[in-house]
C-alpha cells in the first residue's frame, strides 16, 4: 500500500489549500513520477496556472511519457544509472539508457532548465561511469546544463570521498 489515493481534483485542492506565500516551485519526484504521467501532467498544468514553476525528477524510463509531461514542466532533473548499477538488470539497461538519453535530448531541445544526476556507490566502476559520460556529452554540452550532480548512495555501498573525487575529476573536463 502506497498511501491514500486522490482524484486529480482532490489533489489540486490539496495543492491550493497548502500553498504558502514563499512557495517558489512544486516538485514532482519520489518513486518514479512518470508511472503516473497523466496525473503529473494535469497537476503540473494546475500549478503553472497558479503562476508557480514546476520541477520533475525522473529516471526517464519511458521517453514517450516524459514527452507527454515536458510541456508542463519548467525544471528537469534526469537521473542516469550506470551500466553496473544494481537498480536494473543488464539485459534491460540498453533500453533504459536509450530512453534516458532521449529525454535529455528533448529537455535540452525544449530549452528546459536541465540537471543531470548520476547515483554512484562503492561498487560503481570508473569505466562504466566514463562510458555513461561519453554517451551524455555526445548529445549535450555543459553550457546547456544547469547542474551535474554526482549523488552517493548512503548506508549501503556508500562510496569513499576518494571515489567521489575520482568521479568528479572525470566529469570536470566536460
What is the predicted function of each stretch?
Residues 1, 168-174:
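Short, intrinsically disordered, charge-balanced linker/junction segments flanking boundaries
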Residues 1-10:
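Canonical Radical SAM [4Fe-4S] cluster-binding loop centered on the CxxxCxxC motif
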Residues 22-25, 34-170:
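Conserved AdoMet/S-adenosylmethionine-binding subsite of the radical SAM
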Residues 10-19:
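A short, N-terminal amphipathic alpha-helix
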Residues 30-31:
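Short acidic donor-binding/metal-coordinating loop in glycosyltransferase active sites
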